[in-house]
A protein has these predicted regions:
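Extracellular glycan-interacting surfaces
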Residues: 1-202
Length: 202
């Protein structure tokens, strides 16, 4: 992908994770930059104007989320304090999940999906508060902006998409990936050399 980048808003905070829910609200976390009004670490912050202005929601000075997911009903995040956290009130309060380490989290088909070291891809059975491996590998996860698909990047850089959580279609390979964002038919993946776009039909 080629083009020109441009700053949004005046913030110089170091955002480590960003998620968007179906209403367009952005949720983020990371480290406070110079002149920032936020705590360090930032906890969960929110923007309702596409990232121009942000407000603190919770966990300021406590949590540094490195992966976040939001679907309009729940927010899930993995924090570097070693906590998987779950909220059903837009981040005002949190419940702990069953793992202490996760590469990435995603919300898809009303389920929390996790990419976990030494486990691979798994879902969270909330009733039993336990993870259930699904037999696939993954280090990065992303749900399409309209919730219609989920993408995963494997440890070998292979990229797959699912529309139902069971059947996966390979879209390509990118090598070592650092971040991913997706729509139903496209994934944008950040690597050490730039941003790559993969597309798949259907």
């Amino acid at each position: 992908v080629t083009g020109v980048t441009e700053s949004v808003g005046d913030s110089r905070d170091d955002l480590m994770a960003v998620a968007q829910d179906p209403t367009g609200a952005l949720f983020a976390s990371g480290h406070a930059g110079p002149g920032s009004p936020f705590s360090e670490p930032m906890g969960l912050i929110r923007s309702d104007d596409a990232g121009r202005a942000w407000s603190e929601i919770s966990l300021g000075g406590e949590a540094d989320f490195h992966s976040l997911a939001a679907d309009g009903t729940a927010i899930a995040g993995w924090a570097t304090t070693g906590a998987l956290l779950w909220s059903e009130d837009e981040g005002d309060s949190w419940l702990p999940g069953p793992v202490t380490t996760a590469y990435s989290v995603a919300l898809f088909m009303e389920q929390l999906w996790l990419a976990i070291p030494d486990v691979g891809l798994a879902t969270w059975n909330r009733d039993a508060n336990a993870i259930e491996p699904v037999g696939e590998e993954g280090v990065l996860l992303a749900t399409a902006d309209d919730g219609s698909a989920m993408w995963r990047v494997g440890p070998d850089g292979s990229v797959h998409r699912t529309l139902n959580g069971r059947e996966w279609r390979q879209a390509g390979s990118v090598g070592a990936a650092e971040a991913i964002a997706a729509s139903r038919n496209s994934a944008f993946i950040v690597t050490a050399t730039g941003v790559q776009r993969l597309q798949v039909g259907g």
